[in-house]
Curated annotation (Swiss-Prot):
Domain of life: Bacteria
InterPro entries: Peptide_deformylase, Peptide_deformylase_sf
Coiled coil: none
GO terms for biological process, alphabetical: co-translational protein modification; translation
Protein name, entry field: Peptide deformylase 2
Substrates-to-products reaction catalysed: N-terminal N-formyl-L-methionyl-[peptide] + H2O = N-terminal L-methionyl-[peptide] + formate
Keywords: Hydrolase, Iron, Metal-binding, Protein biosynthesis
């Protein structure tokens, strides 16, 4: 297992459309690496393969306090949603910036688990929001794409400042 570098905006690899995984057995190491990378962050609850420069349609999420209940979603799709609300979001690929984004508060997601078995998850509240956020990454979308141009500029200024500090 390895901790991978998390890309930050405006890295063009974050905008790449993910490719469907056809052989789940072939991505087990990537799944392990995504989880290890997620667990190395201070406050991350989800990570998508494009955030580490990979094109596979894989998302990992862990909302547990002890970070020991991973949810692995391969080829996930939001098949329905209801009750939109505004809520604050952040992103490991847009460090140090948070903004209100409108999302469904209840969703149905279909995916494969890490063993290739079909999953259908009906969920609400925070998990529903995290799933939508991470699945957006698979389409090359970031949460800041839902913001006004002015707020997008503010977000990118924060990211540039973060990257300068990190480069020291």
């Amino acid at each position: 297992m390895a901790v991978l570098e998390i890309l930050t905006a405006p890295d063009p690899r974050l905008r790449v459309q993910s490719k469907e995984v056809t052989d789940v057995a072939a991505v087990q190491t990537l799944i392990d690496d995504l989880l290890e990378t997620l667990y190395e962050t201070d406050n991350g609850v989800g990570l998508a393969a494009p955030q580490v420069g990979r094109e596979e349609a894989i998302v990992v999420i862990d909302l547990s306090e002890n970070r020991d209940e991973p949810l692995v979603l391969v080829n996930p799709k939001v098949v329905s949603g209801s009750n939109k609300e505004m809520g604050q979001e952040g992103c490991l690929s847009v460090p140090d910036y948070y903004a209100d984004v409108e999302r469904y508060t209840s969703v149905v997601v279909e995916a494969l688990d890490r063993d290739g078995k079909p999953l259908r998850i009906e969920t609400s509240e925070f998990l529903a929001i995290v799933m939508q956020h991470e699945i957006d990454h698979l389409s090359g979308n970031l949460f800041i794409d839902y913001l006004s141009p002015l707020k997008q500029q503010m977000a990118m200024k924060k990211v540039k400042k973060h990257n300068k500090l990190r480069a020291r």
